[in-house]
């Protein structure tokens, strides 16, 4: 038994009748131990092993220096193992530091309110434009394939029901999982989705942001959700019921979301690796302005995709927006070309005209004399992008993970570390998790394509993206450049 300190028990000795002797008178001993009969000890396993093995030959004397050489190699191997362990610990600490920095940043962003964003914000045009793009993605890709437009107002016979409202048996609501929900800024957009939302689950690693999202949801419930009620032709209609919402603090890139009770209740497929996913229960997973944080390393990217694919039912959609890797690659390539041209001009002692031409090629990243190391950077008064280290000359980021840059957005983001999502690599990895690309467009192209849509065009006017009556765009050139840094997408679960 483990923990027993007693020695080995005495073993019974075999009986041998041939060795019997007459009993002898026992001599009294003055000492209790003197003359005591020694008990035979059972052979230990090591004794048995020694008795069975051949006697060791006489060890030959090693040549001088051989032992030292072996010792050096062993010490070097141990040293390398120690360095690897230290590097692993440092990498984990660094990753945790970045994760904490991002979380603390978004926790610290003040909740200024809708009126401030509409009136006092210096980037109100950009805010309105980005919100319109997110609404556009939700409007276009959130409904199920079997959804019939207008089902919320019609009964089973196609008759409008003002007093009773929609027949729940005839309409299935969406089950939405919002990863990186932040402060709940998209709750209103989901309430205005073409197909009504039945359940909304918001996840975010920033606990303060989750608290603010819960408060925003409570305010929406108090207002009745903002749909239905008194409107043209709907005076007798009951206010539309706001969807059921639940919110959780959760790192969706480092841990499985299966531990969340409502996720398990809706359905989560944890079957394993790429290509083996059946289906979860959610109709839509939304990831607005957050997926790029998962590309810090491959493990996080795959955990993120496993969570997304495990949560989505077959036919479900992953929608969202991320920084445009094509824009980043183009900017980096131009910057490096400008740096190279300037270095060559300086070495050759060319004229000031050559210097000026080289600087024009590097217009996206001004270089200051005396810098220890020139790194790619660009931007304007609204946003700034800066890489902390060297970047590929051709702008091709391989391997596709861990390419960090610092991003600044006026009034919103203060030099937060972000990661490039090389688009083709992302698309290929997503296919491993049964996610097939259906849509991908830069924000500026989304505007050009959808601005005259019969639904999305008027929506842009109501959201103050442009003036009423197909008026002028209320987004400055600097704001549009910042918006063009992003791309919207939709993947289908197959």
Residue spans of the language-model regions?
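A short glycine-rich, Lys/Arg-flanked "PGG" loop and its adjoining helix->strand segment in the class I
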Residues: 275, 300-314
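Conserved beta-strand signature within the Rossmann-like core of class I S-adenosyl-L-methionine
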Residues: 314-323
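Ser/Thr-rich, low-complexity intrinsically disordered regulatory regions
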Residues: 1-102, 153-166, 230-232, 351-365
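C-terminal lobe and adjacent flexible extensions of AdoMet/dcAdoMet transferase-like proteins
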Residues: 85, 335, 339, 370, ...
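A short SAM/SAH-binding and catalytic strip from SAM-dependent methyltransferases
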Residues: 267-299
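Class I SAM-dependent methyltransferase SAM/SAH-binding core
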Residues: 185-261
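Class I SAM-dependent methyltransferase Rossmann-like catalytic core
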Residues: 83-173
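Conserved class I S-adenosyl-L-methionine
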Residues: 172-182, 201
């Amino acid at each position: 038994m483990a923990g027993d300190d007693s020695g080995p028990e005495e073993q019974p000795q075999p009986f041998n009748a041939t060795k019997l002797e007459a009993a002898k008178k026992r001599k009294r001993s003055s000492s209790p131990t003197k003359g005591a009969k020694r008990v035979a000890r059972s052979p230990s396993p090591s004794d048995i092993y020694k008795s069975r093995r051949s006697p060791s030959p006489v060890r030959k004397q090693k040549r001088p220096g051989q032992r030292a050489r072996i010792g050096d190699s062993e010490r070097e191997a141990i040293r390398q193992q120690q360095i690897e362990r230290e590097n692993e610990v440092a990498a984990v600490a660094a990753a945790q530091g970045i994760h904490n920095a991002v979380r603390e940043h978004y926790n610290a962003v003040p909740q200024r309110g809708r009126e401030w964003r509409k009136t006092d914000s210096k980037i109100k045009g950009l805010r309105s434009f980005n919100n319109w793009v997110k609404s556009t993605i939700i409007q276009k890709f959130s409904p199920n394939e079997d959804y019939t437009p207008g089902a919320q107002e019609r009964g089973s016979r196609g008759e409008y029901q003002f007093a009773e409202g929609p027949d729940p048996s005839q309409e299935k609501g969406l089950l939405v999982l919002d990863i990186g929900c932040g402060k709940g800024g998209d709750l209103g957009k989901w309430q205005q989705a073409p197909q009504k939302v039945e359940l909304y689950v918001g996840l975010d690693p920033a606990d303060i942001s989750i608290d603010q999202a819960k408060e925003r949801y409570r305010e929406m419930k108090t207002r009745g959700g903002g749909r239905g009620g008194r409107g043209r032709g709907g005076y007798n209609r009951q206010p539309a019921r706001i969807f059921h919402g639940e919110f959780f603090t959760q790192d969706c890139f480092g841990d499985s979301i299966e531990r969340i009770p409502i996720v398990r209740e809706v359905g989560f497929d944890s079957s394993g690796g790429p290509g083996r996913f059946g289906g979860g229960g959610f109709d839509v997973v939304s990831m607005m302005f957050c997926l790029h944080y998962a590309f810090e390393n491959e493990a996080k990217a795959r955990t993120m995709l496993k969570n997304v694919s495990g949560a989505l039912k077959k036919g479900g959609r992953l929608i969202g927006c991320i920084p445009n890797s094509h824009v980043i690659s183009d900017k980096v390539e131009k910057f490096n070309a400008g740096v190279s041209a300037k270095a060559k001009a300086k070495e050759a002692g060319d004229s000031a005209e050559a210097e000026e031409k080289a600087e024009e090629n590097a217009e996206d990243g001004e270089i200051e004399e005396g810098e220890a190391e020139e790194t790619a950077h660009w931007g304007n008064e609204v946003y700034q992008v800066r890489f902390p280290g060297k970047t590929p000359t051709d702008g091709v980021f391989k391997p596709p993970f861990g390419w960090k840059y610092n991003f600044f957005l006026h009034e919103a983001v203060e030099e937060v570390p972000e990661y490039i999502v090389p688009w083709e690599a992302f698309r290929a990895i997503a296919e491993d998790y049964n996610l097939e690309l259906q849509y991908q467009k830069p924000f500026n192209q989304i505007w050009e394509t959808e601005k005259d849509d019969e639904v999305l065009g008027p929506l842009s006017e109501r959201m103050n993206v442009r003036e009423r009556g197909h008026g002028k765009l209320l987004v400055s050139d600097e704001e549009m450049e910042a918006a063009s840094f992003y791309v919207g997408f939709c993947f289908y679960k197959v």
